[in-house]
């Protein structure tokens, strides 16, 4: 039963349905990967407007309905892209080599990529710049 404002609803409505963890395992694993990503970099934990303004930069896209941005600080750089379309869309990358840190299924791919990448339909991806050693 769904309730828009369930603060005073019975436990049945507000209880955690633990069996759904198995039913929606892909979603559970994706959320775990998002939490791991957030914990892994202070760039995903900025909590002031000044920090966000200093380290977030929107990137140019030929398609105005697609959006991508760069988070960069102290040599660490991430590119995040959102594709709202039902087909693949291409995005550009800043200078350097990147790897796919998080795809639409929560997976990572350490294969280096540079110049551009393709974002799958109806998804978000996160790329991380490979640090030069």
Residue ranges and their predicted role:
Residues 110-133:
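C-terminal beta-strand-rich structural cap/linker in extracellular carbohydrate-active enzymes
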Residues 94-107:
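Solvent-exposed beta-hairpin/edge-strand motifs
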Residues 27, 99-102, 115:
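A broadly tuned, weak detector of single residues within folded domains
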Residues 74, 84-87, 105, 124, ...:
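Short, glycine-/Ser/Thr-/acidic-enriched flexible segments
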Residues 23, 88, 108-109, 126:
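A broad, structure-centric signal for solvent-exposed, well-ordered loop/edge residues
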Residues 1-96:
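Loop/helix patches that line or flank the sugar-binding groove of alpha-linked glycan CAZymes
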Residues 79-82, 100-101, 128:
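Conserved active-site loop/cleft motifs that coordinate metal ions or position small ligands
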């Amino acid at each position: 039963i769904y309730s828009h404002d369930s603060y005073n609803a019975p436990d049945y409505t507000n209880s955690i349905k633990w069996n759904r963890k198995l039913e929606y395992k892909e979603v559970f694993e994706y959320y775990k990967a998002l939490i791991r990503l957030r914990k892994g970099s202070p760039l995903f934990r900025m909590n002031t407007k000044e920090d966000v303004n200093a380290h977030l930069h929107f990137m140019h896209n030929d398609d105005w309905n697609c959006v991508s941005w760069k988070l960069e600080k102290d040599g660490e750089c991430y590119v995040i892209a959102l594709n709202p379309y039902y087909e693949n869309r291409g995005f550009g990358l800043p200078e350097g080599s990147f790897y796919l840190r998080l795809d639409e299924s929560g997976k990572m791919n350490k294969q280096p990529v540079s110049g551009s990448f393709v974002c799958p339909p109806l998804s978000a991806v996160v790329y991380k710049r490979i640090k030069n050693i």
